[in-house]
A protein has these predicted regions:
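Active-site nucleotide/adenylate-binding loops and adjacent lid/helix of ATP-dependent enzymes
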Residues: 3-29, 34-83, 88-187
């Protein structure tokens, strides 16, 4: 099968911890043909969805890429959106372009309207029975109150990824104010 992965720039991915590369490696081991693309390589020509992609192959130490070519998205067995946050206008427009490609027969995994309207960090709110008590807020006073109640908490942004801006806070932490300003953007 032929799969195209819409990714962040490959040079920014950390091969030892990036889940997109892990998924791709497993797909490669199973004999699938892999291609990579980025958000700005999705487009409409007239009303026709198109994608610029490069054939991707793992090597012992790294990977190789073939020349970028233009394809009809429906020519792939699957398009897999794996772009990390931020959820900005480019991301939003990419989901619209992927919806258009799907309406023309492309098999798009990670449903474009679902990833547009569903924040993965908020998914815990649907299954609270499987999570510790949590608080979702940008209000510093509420976070301090939660910290006083639990004495040891983890705070992280809803739009982060890769462990960025995740902090463990304890009551005696000397940087509580700075951490809360950082995490809430002075909320």
């Amino acid at each position: 099968m032929k799969f195209v992965f819409i990714l962040d720039p490959l040079e920014k991915l950390k091969s030892d911890k990036d889940t997109s590369l892990a998924i791709m490696r497993e797909a490669s081991l199973r004999g699938h043909e892999l291609f990579v693309s980025m958000q700005h390589e999705l487009f409409l020509h007239g009303a026709t969805a198109r994608i610029i992609a490069r054939k991707f192959m793992f090597t012992e130490q790294s990977y190789t890429l073939e020349e970028a070519l233009e394809y009809a998205p429906a020519g792939f067995d699957g398009i897999i959106m794996r772009k990390d946050p931020p959820f900005d206008n480019e991301y939003l427009y990419s989901t619209y372009l992927l919806e258009n490609a799907a309406s023309q027969g492309a098999k798009v995994y990670n449903n474009p309207s679902a990833i547009r309207s569903w924040n993965e960090k908020m998914s815990v709110t649907r299954f609270p029975q499987f999570a510790p008590e949590f608080l979702v807020t940008s209000n510093n006073d509420l976070i301090r109150e939660f910290l006083n109640t639990h004495q040891d908490i983890v705070v992280k942004p809803l739009d982060g990824m890769g462990g960025s801006s995740i902090f463990r806070l304890g009551l005696s932490d000397p940087n509580i104010s700075v951490i809360l300003e950082t995490i809430t953007n002075f909320g």
